[in-house]
Amino acid sequence: MTLIYFVLIFGAIVLAHEFGHYLLAKVNGIHVVEFAIGMGPKLVGFHKNGTDYVIRLLPIGGACMFEGEDGLNEVQGEPSPNSFNAAPVWARISSVVAGPLFNFILAFLLAIFLVGFSGSDKPVILGIMEGYPADEAGMEPGDVITRMNDEKIYLAREIYINTYLNGDKPMKVEYERNGEIFTTQLVPKYSEESGRHLIGLQGYGEAVEAKGLSVFKYAYYEVRYSFLSTIKSLAMLVRGEASKDDVSGPVGIAQVIGEVAEEATPYGPLVLFLNLANIAMLLSVNLGVLNLLPLPALDGGRLVFMLIEAVRGKPIPPEKEGMVHFAGFVALMVLMVFVMYNDIVRLFA
């Protein structure tokens, strides 16, 4: 069943992403040559109105190929009126941005469903560890965390991710007690038992039942949490604070999906669906953020070229841009192979 869940989740995320590109391309009059879900050999497909609609073997990617994009599939001479390069620069930008945007929209819709069924978690402290910084600062159970290092806190899970990523650095914490706001500076203390630095909050989170318009508010908080967690994790990778073992590819993600499904299945189909929907929400945000990185072959890399064009008033030759993106694509494939190899080694270790 793990493979089925993996295919369904990745298929939905990729479909949302590529449909975003497809829809805005149609709105902007750009001809879509191929709309594909998956990578590798073609399984099934059909041709309609000049577009090939294809499902490919590997459910880990997709493509929405525009006519003339990168100068690779357009005949020599002037671009046709419906080609990608013939469209105004802002039309092209919107068509590229739409992919990640639709991932965020999918994540928000899933978050609405999740919050509507299971509510959310208010950042209330449930316990204080004796002898740790929070205890020494006078914090008490029932205090509501409102900010950490000047970042607004809305969910209990944000407390964990912020303390975990903060490490041993001093942390400014703002909290509310009986309507009064307090601020304190906590210096994390190393815990031999947990193997990391702690500020001494022992459990946090108070269930909140979302009703009416508050469902949309808490759904936004859920997507915001996933978005910021992804950004912070990427920042750790860039700074060298995370190792290769902290990075997972498709194999590692499939393993997580399988473990979550195994734990949730005994509680019934609704609990299983909610857990898988939560994973899909996280992955959809993750894909949206990653695609906006300014790297060749990614949507963010294409946006860089188009923004340069918008500023300088003329495009970079499509053939040259195409070579840059092709090189970036090859590099990404090499990276994917490395990550998948690392996943497999961990799986059988």
Residue ranges and their predicted role:
Residues 134-156:
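Conserved PDZ fold ligand-binding element
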Residues 323-343:
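Final/C-terminal transmembrane alpha-helix of multipass membrane proteins
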Residues 26-107, 207-215, 310, 315:
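Membrane-embedded helix-turn/re-entrant segments that form the catalytic/gating core
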Residues 140, 146-147, 161-203:
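PDZ-domain C-terminal substructure recognizer with occasional recognition of PDZ-binding tails
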Residues 114-131:
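Low-complexity, small/polar and acidic-rich linker and loop segments
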Residues 82-83, 87-90, 188-287, 304-327, ...:
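Functional transmembrane alpha-helices
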Residues 17, 55, 134, 142-145, ...:
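Terminal peptide-recognition signature
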Residues 10-14, 65, 103, 107, ...:
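Alpha-helical transmembrane segments of multi-pass membrane proteins
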